[in-house]
Amino acid sequence: IVTMPLLHASLGHLVANTIPLIVLLFLLAGSRARSWVIAIEIIVLGGVILWIFGRSANHLGASVLVYGLIVFLVLGGVFERRPVPIVVALVTFVLYGGSLLWGFIPRTSEVSWDGHLCGAIAGGLLAFQLAHPARLREKLLPLTKARPPASGSGQ
């Protein structure tokens, strides 16, 4: 899960991931404190989601991180509603919006479209959690509490 972004099938695959990764990490570092934590969280969460729900195939490359960063940066601007994240969201969408949509379409078996999707889900969840930590806690809290027995059960 953690080493997947470091493994690539070819030099072309490495270059195809490296260029957007440099741009997206630059945008992340310029707009967020502790950007390295966000990147690691996307790698781990996206990798876990892919491990649970992904196809039985070899998933290589930094696509989980790339797609996670795209969605994180775009939705971060939407959720946070602050000037810098909004500008970063617009720049990210202009640069990578088309790639984002096309990346979810399974075109060949060599492309991990499900890795793209899992990275995007991780990025979206982290963007929401960062902007609304209390709301996420409120939504998850009922799932962790034991429910009292229903009253009037005749006992």
Describe the residue ranges of each PLM region:
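Long, low-complexity, intrinsically disordered segments
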Residues: P149-Q155
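A detector for small-residue-rich transmembrane helices and their helix-helix packing motifs
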Residues: I1-P149
